[in-house]
Amino acid sequence: MEIGKKIKAMRIAENLSQPQMAQLIDISIGTLRNCEQDRTELKTESLMKFTKHKRFKKYAYWLMTDETLPESGQISPDFSILLELGIVEDDTSGKKTA
């Protein structure tokens, strides 16, 4: 699963624009756009900014592993956002899920 789509899902779940998220994480808007469109991979330093930021820590485990640990406060964005972005597929349509 592409990190860019996951970061976009996090941004949408948090009701942030690209400029707002880029400012929070302290990366350029261009870097964020390219990442969300999977044109480029984030450097480790930038990726760590997402996992350490207080607003996005709850997504850190999911961002890195595709799994959640709700009992530890580690969640994924709302399923409808993931479905809309193609991160998961609706298994009621006969397609397999991610």
Model-derived segments and spans:
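A short, Lys/Arg-rich alpha-helix, primarily the initiator
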Residues: 1-14, 20, 97
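Terminal and domain-boundary regions
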Residues: 4, 29, 83-87
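Helix-turn-helix DNA-binding elements, focusing on the entry/boundary residues of the two helices
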Residues: 7, 18, 29, 47
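Recognition helix of helix-turn-helix/homeodomain-like DNA-binding domains
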Residues: 25-42, 46
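Phosphate-coordinating loops and pocket residues in cytosolic domains that bind phosphorylated ligands
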Residues: 34, 52, 64-65
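DNA major-groove recognition helix of helix-turn-helix/homeodomain DNA-binding modules
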Residues: 45-61
